């Protein structure tokens, strides 16, 4: 993992393609261009890059193609990407790592730089008194829940997740 380190988090890019979303992506891609010009470094994504991410075996959420393409270009240019999965995108089952080359983490990521230990965390569920969310998190990450959720068609789960996303 080489410096410089570029850290982004909680972008919540949406699947829909309206002017607002196109403008947000254009700004991000300018940042990516600056990273590529530097020619080296590590991009650390602290979770919730996507507003919703759930993989089926043959299907990933549509509408993210340009984002995935730009992340792949960064990797092809020699930029390492580390992704701490957040509460909106933790249902990655290997696509980001196998198909793009992103190193993914289901929880915190720790590394050393200049004799300092650095911890990157998404932070969801850190509050001990947030009982409701902590219970919800255990349920939606449970393998049985995921198996049941995968029985529904992708369009249904995408629509449901968009509604849930607005409340978290």
State each model region's role:
Residues 1-4, 158:
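Acidic, histidine-bearing metal-coordination/catalytic regions of metal-dependent phosphoesterases
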Residues 108, 115, 127-129:
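Contiguous hydrophobic, core-forming segments of folded domains
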Residues 123-168:
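Active-site-proximal loop/helix segment associated with metal-binding centers of metalloenzymes
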Residues 7-8, 117-121, 128:
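Short hydrophobic-aromatic micro-motifs
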Residues 3-4, 8, 13-113:
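Core catalytic region of metal-dependent phosphoesterases/phosphodiesterases
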């Amino acid at each position: 993992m080489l410096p410089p380190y570029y850290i982004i988090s909680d972008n919540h890019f949406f699947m829909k393609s309206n002017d607002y979303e196109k403008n947000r992506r254009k700004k991000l891609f300018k940042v990516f261009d600056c990273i590529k010009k530097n020619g080296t470094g590590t991009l650390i994504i602290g979770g919730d890059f996507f507003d919703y991410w759930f993989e089926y075996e043959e299907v990933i959420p549509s509408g993210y193609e340009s984002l995935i393409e730009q992340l792949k270009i960064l990797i092809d240019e020699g930029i390492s990407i580390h992704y701490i999965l957040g509460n909106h995108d933790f249902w990655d089952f290997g696509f980001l790592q196998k198909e793009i080359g992103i190193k993914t983490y289901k929880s915190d990521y720790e590394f050393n730089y200049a004799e300092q230990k650095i911890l990157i965390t998404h932070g969801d569920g850190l509050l001990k008194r947030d009982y409701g969310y902590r219970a919800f998190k255990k349920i939606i990450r449970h393998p049985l829940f995921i198996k049941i959720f995968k029985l529904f068609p992708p369009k249904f789960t995408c629509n449901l997740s968009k509604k849930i996303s607005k409340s978290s």
